[in-house]
Amino acid sequence: LRTIIDNLGDTYKYVVVDNEAGMEHISRRTTRDVDMLLIISDPTIRGIKTAESISELAEEIEVNVHQKMLVLNRVTGELPEPLQEAIDKLDLQLGSVIPADPKVNELDALGKPLTQLTSDSPSFREVETLIDKILREI
């Protein structure tokens, strides 16, 4: 897998690798050189602590990560103060706060792809903004 990802990186300008939740893909070093590591978390203290562990593991095993960004997903309302304080203590840029979106839940429940989200969807708009931000920074 590592060789395939390296070869794709030599061929294409952008390679997106979507992994399951957790740290196994980092500890296995499936990627060696990462322009942007997006660490996706739910808006909980436990999720933020896990994001911090993932970030630290990438440094410990010397994966060459150029930039790291935290993305909060399924956020309802304002972030509680303790959560915001935990985020502020991280050595991670908060790249995006994707709002909870009933349309995402509906599509998921029906087994339909998220590509069917319309451009007026709050989560669609936020992800679009995030993509623009990433493309400017890498």
Residue ranges and their predicted role:
Residues I4, A86, L117, L130-K133:
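Residues that form generic nucleotide/phosphate-binding pockets
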Residues A100:
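Active-site donor-binding loop signature of nucleotide-sugar glycosyltransferases
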Residues K49, P82, P122-R125, T129:
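Generic recognition of short, well-ordered alpha-helical interface segments
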Residues R2-V97, E106:
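Conserved catalytic-core segment of NTP-binding enzymes
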Residues L110-S121:
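C-terminal boundary of histidine-terminating zinc-finger modules
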Residues E126-I138:
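C-terminal alpha-helix
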